[in-house]
Amino acid sequence: MEIISVLLCTYNEPLKYLKLSIESILSQTYTNIQLIIVNDNPKRADMADLLAAYAREDSRIKYIVNPSNIGLVSSLNAGLKNAIGKYIARMDADDIATKDRLEKQLEFLQVKSYDIVGCNAIKIDENGKEIGYLNVPTAHEKIKEYQLYGGCVLHPTWLGKREVFEKLEGYRSVY
């Protein structure tokens, strides 16, 4: 089984959401993962303690603490530099992945020979109640059309080949 490196950057998310986010990745049906957690708020002791405890408890976690707040793009690039997986996935620190997200996305990516895939999302409120859906286009022409208006990939839902990010040299700070 190929390794999927999951990038999760955090700055000031409430701990209850951060825990749910981490647990949703650690409990995936696809278990050959590396969860890279980048802490971009080293002054927040409660978060640092929680993340360090997770890293001690699960060897799949690579925990990185930025020396100061460097922003999301630089944090993502720091995570990419530490990724060991053939595939890279994104996860936000206040989102919850379905149990089979990575398994389904990897299967779809491999069967279709795509470089990157994303998915729709269910919107939930602070109590976990479903309040709506974020649907993205799947037809090639619709995807091209949406690109004119800012894109259609929900960033924390994608999974892609590592080679794509190497070719692009990571995230660009100009966006």
What does each of the following model-derived ranges do?
Residues 22-65:
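Acidic donor-binding segment of Leloir-type glycosyltransferases
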Residues 17, 46-47, 76, 97-102, ...:
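Acidic donor-diphosphate engagement hotspot in glycosyltransferases and nucleotidyltransferases
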Residues 6, 81, 138-175:
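Conserved nucleotide-sugar donor-binding catalytic segment
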Residues 100-132:
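Conserved donor NDP-sugar-binding/catalytic core segment of glycosyltransferases
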Residues 92-96, 120:
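The conserved acidic donor/metal-binding loop of glycosyltransferases
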Residues 1-26:
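N-proximal low-complexity "stem/linker" segments adjacent to membrane-targeting elements
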Residues 88:
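Short aromatic/hydrophobic "clamp" motif used to bind/position activated sugar donors
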